[in-house]
């Protein structure tokens, strides 16, 4: 009989912790989820129990982003064996005076939402895209050739490019462009008859006819200067040169251009070359009339 009682006691001793574990798990399931967060990990230290006792639930911890969290002197010097009387005052009471921090920090920043919502990260464009994308009002005014990359644009002079219509420019094929572009860019060279050396007749300079510019033979520079230039070979003003298209302009050799000496361009004034030296008098700057360190009465007496 005694043996039976002993075996029952031993069995109860082994079964007791298992029953406690099962009861704890049932309590864990039935508890409020805010309290369950505190008991998620097994607590082995008494200090940890007291710290968890002061922590807020997770729903209240979100207010820490808006409300500053200060430890009072009572909590700072607190021994973990004794709890403060008012737990809420111990956590929220600020050690910093209200004069240092504005009153806004002690209130929750519940500001009204702005009507204009900020752009999301996907809608915000980078600097390069903002720089490269043309604006809406520029799309209507920018020609198509300028919107193309530089290497795809036609390499034509300005007066030729404007003379071509838009549909003519687009109708040109790629191989036609390659042929036409160098022809348009070439300067105007008049056609002349090429004679062999045996067929050329060299006349003395007095008997030579004064030929046109395109019929004139190739001469040395010092012989060309002897020939009188025609009226049309005279140098036109710069504005007339620019009005005429480039192929129709006459190419004037440099020895026929009207050159001016640097002294004849503008009347040289001696003061422009070397300005007048003005003597610098530092007296009024160093010693003012009414200095600030003397009173007006002393100045009147002196």
Curated annotation (Swiss-Prot):
Record's note on what induces expression: Maximal induction is dependent upon prolactin and insulin.
Give the tissue specificity.
Answer: Mammary gland specific. Secreted in milk.
Family classification = Belongs to the beta-casein family.
**The UniProt record lists the keyword Repeat:** yes
Q: Which residues carry this modification: Phosphoserine?
A: 23, 25
Q: Which organism is it from?
A: Notamacropus eugenii (Tammar wallaby)
The job of this chain, per UniProt, is described as:
Important role in determination of the surface properties of the casein micelles.
> Among its keywords, does the record have Lipid metabolism?
no
Q: Which cell locations does it reside in?
A: Secreted
This chain's protein is named Beta-casein
Where are the annotated segments for 16 X approximate tandem repeats? 144-269
| Coiled-coil boundaries | none
Keyword list (alphabetical) reads: Milk protein, Phosphoprotein, Repeat, Secreted, Signal
The sequence repeats lie at: 144-151, 152-159, 160-167, 168-175, 176-182, 183-190, 191-198, 199-204, 205-214, 215-222, 223-230, 231-238, 241-247, 248-255, 256-262, 263-269
Grouped into one coarse class, the protein's main location is secreted
- CC annotations in GO: extracellular region
Q: Which residues form the signal peptide?
A: 1-15
Report the gene name.
Answer: CSN2
